[in-house]
Amino acid sequence: MAHKKAGGSTRNGRDSEAKRLGVKRFGGEAVLAGSIIVRQRGTKFHAGTNVGCGRDHTLFALTDGKVKFEVKGPKNRKFISIVAE
């Protein structure tokens, strides 16, 4: 008779839910005040002019205008600004 011993239980098989991070509004896009521009962990992007930074480092528009991405400073940091139209 063909017999097989029962397999042990596994401790794998779980994964956390995706957090939907990333850029939500791209360069040149028109935004309204309060619009979320980037959801991020830490400051991959820094807040420039007319951009606020939330408690979880979410960047959002403080005024209406167009999104502008720029690289500034000796450390080549990425800044996001809102340029009034």
From Swiss-Prot:
- What gene does the UniProt entry assign to this protein? rpmA
> What are the GO cellular component annotations?
cytosolic large ribosomal subunit
Question: Which family is this sequence assigned to?
Answer: Belongs to the bacterial ribosomal protein bL27 family.
Keyword list, A-Z: Ribonucleoprotein, Ribosomal protein
Query: What is this protein's record name?
Result: Large ribosomal subunit protein bL27
The record's region (Disordered) falls at 1-20
- Single Gene Ontology BP term? translation
Origin organism is Klebsiella pneumoniae subsp. pneumoniae (strain ATCC 700721 / MGH 78578)
HAMAP family named in the record: Ribosomal_bL27 (MF_00539)
The molecular function terms of the Gene Ontology recorded here are: structural constituent of ribosome
Say if the entry is tagged with keyword Ribonucleoprotein: yes
Establish whether keyword Cell division is in the entry. Answer: no
Pfam families of this UniProt entry?
Ribosomal_L27
**Entry-linked NCBIfam families:** L27
